[in-house]
């Protein structure tokens, strides 16, 4: 097993995407997801995933069942008030990225939990972002 990861919306959607035959559509994303010792799903990410899966309710129900099953490696993490505040600070500090609240809370959660491995399709924003007290810690983007 590899170290824990935080799942961002695009990364989680790609990791779960399947072909009509049931094979992974994005094998590298699925491998990153299935090899992680813990998959942290931020609350705002789950809400955004729900929006994108609005035409695939069965897939959303399956994902929610897996996330909330204590026997899986998923951990659902609601944003703390301090995460929201930090997300807004990061959004202001890195204004050129237009992070927004969802990506900002992913970064704030990474900072708070000290889990810097992010499953994401958003290379531009998360690649430029730095976290930590002095904003010097890069995030490790997967895959």
What is the predicted function of each stretch?
Residues 5-8, 41-42, 99-101, 122, ...:
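Histidine- and aromatic-rich ligand-binding microenvironments
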Residues 44-79:
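Active-site-proximal, substrate-binding regions of enzyme catalytic domains
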Residues 75-121:
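Active-site neighborhoods of divalent-metal-dependent phosphate/nucleic-acid chemistry enzymes
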Residues 37, 73-75, 139:
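Short, conserved active-site loop motifs that form the nucleotide-linked donor/cofactor pocket
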Residues 1-41, 53-65, 136:
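Short, well-structured N-terminal submotif of metal-dependent ribonuclease cores
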């Amino acid at each position: 097993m590899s170290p824990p990861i935080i799942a961002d919306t695009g990364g989680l959607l790609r990791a779960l995407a399947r072909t009509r035959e049931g094979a992974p559509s994005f094998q590298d994303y699925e491998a990153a997801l299935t090899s992680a010792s813990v998959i942290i799903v931020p609350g705002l990410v789950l809400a955004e995933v729900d929006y994108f899966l609005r035409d695939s309710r069965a897939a959303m129900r399956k994902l929610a069942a897996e996330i909330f099953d204590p026997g899986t490696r998923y951990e659902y993490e609601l944003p703390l008030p301090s995460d929201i505040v930090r997300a807004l600070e990061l959004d202001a500090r890195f204004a050129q990225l237009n992070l927004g609240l969802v990506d900002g809370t992913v970064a704030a959660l990474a900072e708070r939990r000290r889990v810097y491995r992010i499953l994401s399709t958003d290379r531009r924003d998360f690649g430029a972002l730095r976290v930590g007290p002095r904003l010097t810690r890069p995030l490790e983007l997967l895959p």
